[in-house]
């Protein structure tokens, strides 16, 4: 049997992923900061999923952006339905830690969100982010529209030029459309750094400015 460490740098193959469960994990459907629901139809609003390392600090980055209606943390991009945190940490789900960002496109542009995303982590590190190592920490943008996907690809290419000039390697961010299923994480992980102000935050950007979203 493969040990947990075997899945730190590669995705589980068919038959290796944990089976998960059919029932969603319990969720207190109220955002601790703004009181908006975490799960719903969100009519008239846009959605995107971002993965940029540990989702505790990543979520805080986005709930502080004006125009963002709500945020939630969860697991996406893998094979295991309704996975738990411990299962995701095993590497045997294939999920990355993701932040669901629901926003008013009239109040904040997708390009502005992309700029926050790129500048808040190092997207060249593959299956890790800083000292956090594993497939769950990979960089990802999961898009809900073709327009988002096109903008994400364009932003990646523009940011790659800046990173290359600064001596960084190739961007490894996974960009997908349509977005995979977003499985909400356990309650304690939602708005974690608001509940635990001194909690761990491993986010660290490259210091390289992203050239998009400046005038949006």
From Swiss-Prot:
Provide the catalytic activity annotation.
L-methionyl-[protein] + [thioredoxin]-disulfide + H2O = L-methionyl-(S)-S-oxide-[protein] + [thioredoxin]-dithiol; [thioredoxin]-disulfide + L-methionine + H2O = L-methionine (S)-S-oxide + [thioredoxin]-dithiol
**Where does it sit, as one GO cellular component term?**
cytoplasm
In its keyword annotation, does this UniProt entry include Oxidoreductase?
yes
Q: Which keywords, in A-to-Z order, does the entry hold? A: Oxidoreductase
Q: Which residues form the active site?
A: 54
Query: Which Gene Ontology molecular-function terms are recorded?
Result: L-methionine-(S)-S-oxide reductase activity; peptide-methionine (S)-S-oxide reductase activity
One Pfam match, by short name? Answer: PMSR
Q: Which GO terms fall under biological process for this protein?
A: cellular response to oxidative stress; protein modification process
Which residues are the signal sequence here? none
Instruction: Please state the Enzyme Commission number of this protein.
Output: 1.8.4.11
> What general EC class does the enzyme of this chain belong to?
oxidoreductase
Does the keyword Chloroplast belong to this entry? no
| Family annotation (PANTHER family) | MITOCHONDRIAL PEPTIDE METHIONINE SULFOXIDE REDUCTASE (PTHR42799:SF2)
What does this chain do? Answer: Has an important function as a repair enzyme for proteins that have been inactivated by oxidation. Catalyzes the reversible oxidation-reduction of methionine sulfoxide in proteins to methionine.
What the record says about family reads:
Belongs to the MsrA Met sulfoxide reductase family.
Q: What is this protein called?
A: Peptide methionine sulfoxide reductase MsrA
Taxonomic source organism: Xanthomonas campestris pv. campestris (strain 8004)
Q: What is the lineage of its organism?
A: Bacteria, Pseudomonadati, Pseudomonadota, Gammaproteobacteria, Lysobacterales
